[in-house]
Swiss-Prot record:
Family annotation (NCBIfam families): clpX, PRK05342.1
Subunit structure: Component of the ClpX-ClpP complex. Forms a hexameric ring that, in the presence of ATP, binds to fourteen ClpP subunits assembled into a disk-like structure with a central cavity, resembling the structure of eukaryotic proteasomes.
Protein name per UniProt: ATP-dependent Clp protease ATP-binding subunit ClpX
Lineage: Bacteria, Bacillati, Bacillota, Clostridia, Thermoanaerobacterales
Annotated organism of origin: Thermoanaerobacter sp. (strain X514)
Residues the record lists as binding ATP: P116, T117, G118, S119, G120, K121, T122, L123
Binding-site list for Zn(2+): C12, C15, C34, C37
């Protein structure tokens, strides 16, 4: 505070009020500012800061726009993309709305993605976070255990999100967390057991509070909580949780519920092999998840259940070529950096898709297959001169012949890469 000077009446350089008209007058090099102007400046800064952090309703993409963005990265799964687009739009619309205390309360709706391995569950969640420009974290449910046992506490999931937000808690509180392998924490048996299920039902119980919305205490360095430790507090009310799992065998539970009950002559019998798996999964109900081993309280906190279809051969071929970051486009870019144009024969792409289906790894297995095929090619080409084009054929995929090379000489002679001796 500036002391009163009888020689000169000090006044605020901004509003012009004298020292005796205000409570405080702060002095700087040749200037003064009063407490009223400081308060006004603080209000202006706070308003601008809130506008920067809050995603306005006008800026929030509409469900159709969200689906169009997902289409650029995720092939197929039309029903799942539509359901996710609506769910995510409603979630962030709820966050951005300024609801009065006496108004209708909009509850959070977390999402459960259910589908085979490699069908695009993780990619869908990652792509949503990319579009919305919010912090995103992936957690593995299999590493979680109930508090007090060896393994990770559920609060460590939140630490990953805080780290993704560069420890900006306000930003993290509007993020997305994808919990993978959620089916692995199913109750080990349908009936409650005397022995404690610390990595199954116990984890489900521990997740309930953060899924619903609570002020969680997170250890800054991760690991177990202990007394006299400082914690980071984070409100999970507006964090969107997307849980994903393959739920292998749940189709049998659904079938037993919707299947025909009649027996004897004339009974209508239809085996699961004759039914389409995606059609069976589309009939999933909460009681099926309950019978699988998920507890009722957990099911209630993930009300939106989205099923993903198994990927067909055509889907896998499209995944190889169509998305913005398609695998073939990535390899083409790598070869382009060496001045070589890379092409994949249509039959070769079909064969790669067949191999992925045979391995039952879905889209996730495509990269491993391509790495095996491309190893010798990527080893030889950087050392070869004057190569203009490299064509991956069906024979190359089967490892019966090297790829076709087009050289940039006058004759455009086609040559073959000599097979490198394989070490058995």
């Amino acid at each position: 505070m500036v002391k009163y000077d009888n020689q000169k009446q000090l006044k605020c350089s901004f509003c012009g009020k004298t020292q005796d008209q205000v409570k405080r007058l702060v002095a700087g090099p040749g200037v003064y500012i009063c407490d009223e102007c400081i308060e006004l400046c603080q209000e202006i800064i706070n308003e601008e800061f809130e506008e920067d952090i809050d995603m306005g309703i006008g800026e929030l993409p509409k469900p159709k726009e969200i689906k169009e963005f997902l289409d650029q990265y995720v092939i197929g799964q039309e029903k799942a993309k539509k359901a996710l687009a609506v769910a995510v739009y409603n979630h962030y619309k709820r966050i951005n709305s300024r609801i009065k205390p006496d108004d209708v309360e909009l509850q959070k709706s977390n999402i459960l993605l259910l589908g085979p391995t490699g069908s695009g569950k993780t990619l869908l969640a990652q792509t949503l976070a990319k579009l919305l420009n919010v912090p995103f974290a992936i957690a593995d449910a299999t590493s979680l255990t109930e508090a007090g046992y060896v393994g990770e506490d559920v609060e460590n999931i939140l630490l990953k999100l805080i780290q993704a937000a560069d420890y900006d808690i306000e930003k993290a509180e509007k993020g997305i967390i994808y919990i993978d392998e959620i089916d692995k924490i199913a109750r080990k048996s349908e009936n409650p057991s005397i022995t404690r299920d610390v990595s199954g039902e116990g984890v489900q119980q521990a997740l309930l509070k953060i899924l619903e919305g609570t002020i969680a205490n997170v250890p800054p360095q991760g690991g177990r909580k202990h007394p006299h430790q400082e914690f980071i507090q984070i409100d999970t009310t507006n964090i969107l949780f997307i849980c994903g799992g393959a739920f292998e065998g749940i189709e049998k539970i659904i079938e037993s519920r919707i299947g025909k009950k009649s027996l004897g002559f004339g009974a209508e019998v239809q085996s699961r092999k004759e039914k389409d798996l995606s059609e069976i999964l589309s009939h999933i109900m909460p009681q099926d998840l309950l019978k699988f081993g998920m507890i009722p309280e957990f099911i209630g906190r993930v009300p939106i259940v989205v099923t993903l279809d198994p990927l067909s051969k055509d889907d896998l071929v499209r995944i190889l070529t169509e998305p913005k970051n398609a695998l073939t486009k990535q390899y083409e870019k790598l070869f382009e950096l060496d001045g070589v144009k890379l092409e994949f024969d249509k039959k070769a792409l079909g064969l790669i898709a067949d191999m992925a289906l045979e391995r039952k790894t879905g889209a996730r297995g495509l990269r491993a297959i391509l790495e095996e095929i491309m190893l010798d090619v990527m080893y030889e080409i950087p050392s070869s001169d004057n190569i203009e084009k490299c064509i991956i054929t069906e024979e190359t995929v089967l490892k019966k012949a090297p790829p076709t090379l087009v050289y940039s000489d006058a004759q455009k002679a086609k040559k073959k890469i000599k097979k490198t001796e394989s070490v058995s």
